[in-house]
A protein has these predicted regions:
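Alpha-helical transmembrane segments in inner-membrane proteins
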Residues: 1-324
Length: 324
């Protein structure tokens, strides 16, 4: 999978309206490390380093984050339909971004608002779920549905009162998900936030298999599953918040990719989580290449992931629903 990701990584730099030969591409990318004589034009360097490199890196980061978050949530809740938006993180991010656009904030503040509201949404879910009676897992799922619906209603109201000429189209486009106009500052923000969520998740993957045990079995082994579950939820939430805040709503990646990864390496989280990260990065990179190459006008990436992910998930259900 790493070789596939590398091939797609290089292919992404070649695709585009401005032609950059592969030989020149490699020289441009390596010129920052090695002293290479310049044989490329300044326009080639701008296209590769300022336009395509940030976008390619962000596609890899977002795909990796969403897939890792989906794997974490599916393991915690023991639910094959669990996705990164199960606790309302995506709905909260949408409300934050829509509010920032409505109030005329800069692109940086749109990302900050989306990230903050995403964390706020999950905090409310955990607050409600932990104080309700009954099963902790079921309470979190129900609270996620309710809080997500509340934030979705807030987003709908913001769209209703937004200026239909300028603000509403911008809100709508953000909600459809896109990686266009990515800057290195955005990539840096995403990388730092995602590292905060991904590193603990990778360190915990040896223990995540224990979440499949019953409460009595875990207690007999002296394992605090509540603490482990909370740590995984927090890590997956930070990953989801970071991904959605910089890319908008991109669905199906965190739902489909973990299932495909299980088909390849099995259910052991020690191998499953790294595979999901690589697979997710490669998948979103491929879809982003399609988004900017299929038509003259760029297609929002959230639309393409739905077109690709939904039919493929149906195929998985038909061919082996008992293995989902």
């Amino acid at each position: 999978m790493a070789s596939v990701l590398l091939a797609l990584f290089l292919l992404s730099f070649v695709l585009g309206r401005y032609d950059v030969p592969l030989a020149q591409l490699l020289k441009i990318l390596l010129s920052g490390i090695f002293p290479i004589e310049q044989t490329w034009t300044d326009n080639m360097a701008i296209a590769v380093l300022n336009v395509r490199l940030p976008r390619v890196l962000l596609a890899c980061l977002v795909g990796c984050a969403l897939s890792a978050a989906g794997t974490g949530y599916q393991t915690v809740f023991q639910n094959p339909m669990a996705a990164p938006d199960i606790l309302g993180a995506s709905s909260g991010a949408c409300t934050g971004a829509a509010l920032a656009i409505l109030t005329g904030q800069s692109s940086v503040m749109i990302t900050v608002f989306a990230f903050g509201f995403s964390l706020l949404s999950v905090a409310l879910v955990y607050l409600v779920g932990s104080h309700a009676r009954g099963s902790r897992v079921m309470n979190l799922l129900l609270a996620g549905i309710m809080v997500g619906s509340l934030f979705s209603a807030c987003t709908s109201y913001i769209k209703l009162v937004a200026d239909p000429t300028n603000q509403l189209p911008e809100i709508t486009y953000w909600l459809m998900g896109s990686l266009s106009g990515t800057r290195m500052s955005t990539v840096t923000f995403a990388a730092v936030c995602m590292a905060v969520g991904l590193v603990p998740l990778l360190l915990l993957r040896w223990r995540m298999n224990l979440l499949t045990l019953s409460a009595d079995e875990a207690r007999a082994m002296g394992i605090h599953t509540d603490r482990l579950r909370l740590a995984v939820i927090l890590s997956a939430t930070v990953l989801t918040a970071a991904a959605v805040s910089v890319s908008g709503m991109i669905g199906w990646v965190g739902l489909v990719i973990p299932h495909l990864s299980r088909r390849i390496v099995g259910n052991d989280c020690r191998r499953l989580l790294p595979m999901a990260c690589l697979f997710g990065a490669a998948f979103l990179l491929l879809v982003d290449n399609m988004a900017r190459s299929l038509t003259a006008t760029e297609i929002p990436i959230g639309i393409l992931t739905a077109f690709v992910g939904a039919p493929f998930f149906i195929y998985l259900m038909v061919k082996g629903g008992d293995r989902l």
